[in-house]
Amino acid sequence: MLVNDHKGRCVFVYNRTQETFVATEARVADGYFSRLIGLLGKRRQWARPGQGLWIVPSHGVHTIGMLFPLDLVFLDSKKRVVHVEEHVRPFRISAVSLKAYSVLELPPHTIFRTGTQEGDQLEIGPMAGQGEGPPAPDGRADVLKSGVPK
């Protein structure tokens, strides 16, 4: 299964196509309650660049009860981007993508900043200290000199 390796953890999200990090610290929501609650009631401080929530499985989300807008990236089971929605305001319902297996909820402007678009291939992996290898000094995933995650 796609998320068993990341259960109850934070992950990094790297866009291999655009060669940029989409999120350096995305929480995994793969249980009933974690998917149900998601980011409801979270304050705007959550929406800093690099933050995120990876909802697995999911074909769509809503922002009812949200306090700030979100960018949404819909991924298939191979972590390829199948749909994006920018700046989804609170109290809205996103599109439903039957091609999607999971959804990334990201701070506003992340899609624009990273150039993420349909067809991009993402890599999602454990943050340093939660998987193999030594943690990086800043607590983020180790990165090769080329900028590609290990």
Predicted segments, located by residue:
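Compact, glycine-rich, soluble single-domain proteins
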Residues: 1-150
